[in-house]
């Protein structure tokens, strides 16, 4: 899980992340590597970058083809926006349109099949973009 320091708005987020960090540290100390939920895949090395109104995205790197929880915050409030996952300009996933606020740490479950699709495209970076949409 790496070294992590960022502000959470809920104690639940702090607890969950600290438990994950502790499990990863224990696995690493026992020689099992840093991955706890999935085995690191030597062929999987994806950088995660924010775009649109997303200020940042965590984790910044994905090393396993497994369901991965992405956390992010938006830079400004918006009533209608959509989370999109892009690889080399191609949209791999689009979420439902909904409201976002900068004060809320958002999370997004990135399915393993989306990670695999990015790897199949031969990219080393995916983009988590939160894009405002015009309501009709």
Give the residues covered by each predicted segment.
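Residues forming the flavin
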Residues: 1-136
């Amino acid at each position: 899980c790496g070294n992590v320091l960022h502000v959470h708005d809920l104690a639940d987020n702090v607890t969950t992340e600290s438990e994950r960090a502790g499990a990863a540290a224990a696995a690493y100390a026992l020689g099992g590597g840093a991955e706890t939920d999935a085995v690191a895949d030597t062929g999987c090395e994806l950088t995660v970058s924010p775009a649109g109104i997303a200020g940042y995205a965590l984790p910044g790197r994905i090393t396993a083809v497994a369901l991965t929880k992405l956390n992010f915050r938006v830079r400004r409030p918006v009533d209608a926006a959509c989370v999109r996952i892009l690889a080399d300009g191609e949209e791999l996933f689009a979420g439902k349109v909904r409201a976002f606020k900068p004060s809320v740490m958002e999370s997004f479950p990135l399915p393993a099949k989306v990670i695999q699709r990015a790897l199949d495209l031969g990219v080393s970076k995916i983009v988590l973009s939160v894009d405002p949409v015009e309501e009709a």
